[in-house]
């Protein structure tokens, strides 16, 4: 297992657990980041800024790196075609 912030660009992984306070976990689930959802890392903003990800529904989201560190994912897959 690894965390969402460590997925390399253009790779995807499935969320396995949200290791967050209940309110933060509920917010992530409300925007589509929940257990079982596949997430593709598009890019990370420079200087520790947010991560730009795409979820399996096609929605693109910006996720704070601090929150992403607390989202467990399975092993990233091979590079995703663009």
Please tell me what each predicted stretch does.
Residues 25, 46-54:
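Short, Lys/Arg- and Gly-enriched loop/turn segments at beta-strand edges
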Residues 20-27:
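Short alpha-helix capping/helix-loop boundary micro-motifs
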Residues 30-31, 51-63:
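Short, compositionally biased
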Residues 65-82:
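Glycine- and charge-enriched low-complexity intrinsically disordered segments
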């Amino acid at each position: 297992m690894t965390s969402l912030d460590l997925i390399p660009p253009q790779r995807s992984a499935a969320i396995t657990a949200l290791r967050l306070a209940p309110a933060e976990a509920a917010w992530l689930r409300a925007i589509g980041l929940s257990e079982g959802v596949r997430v593709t890392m598009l890019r990370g903003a420079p200087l520790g800024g947010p991560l730009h990800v795409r979820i399996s529904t096609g929605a693109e989201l910006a996720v704070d790196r601090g929150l992403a560190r607390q989202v467990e994912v399975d092993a990233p897959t091979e590079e995703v075609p663009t």
